[in-house]
Amino acid sequence: MALDSQGIVDRLASHAMSLGIFDRVNTHEPKNAPGRGLSCAIWVQRIDPAGTLSGLSSTTGRITFNVRCYTNMLQQPEDAIDPNLLRAVDALISAYSGDFTLGGTVRNVDLLGMGGSGGLYVEAGYLNMNERIYRLMTLWVPILVNDLWDQAA
């Protein structure tokens, strides 16, 4: 299977945009602070072989994307910040679970870690950007692509 890199990024972003909960969806890691509201950014974090799913003539690849949801942590009401982010993350996981081949562009979103390095997970944290502090939740979304690299002696 050839790597449809743009197709994969487009499908990940399309799901985020279709939810109607983000004020903006970027397909890159932002260099500047976003505007107000809830933001989503998508970029590649890691690429490695999925040995347990590979054969003797080709290697299945695992491409892990960061899908980061973030919002200004100084907004009011403060008690709504984490629940709003959690709702966004839950909606994204549901969307990726419901279309785990991303429209046939990949073998599957590795929800449960069948590729050998753990499945989809979320990590919360904070980010200081342009002297503003953001609360964030980052989804680590591993994508499996069959026969990505040929093997030869």
Please place each PLM-identified region on the residue numbering.
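Two-metal-ion RNase H-like nuclease active-site motif
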Residues: 42
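Charged, amphipathic alpha-helical segments and their flanking helix caps
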Residues: 1-34, 46-153
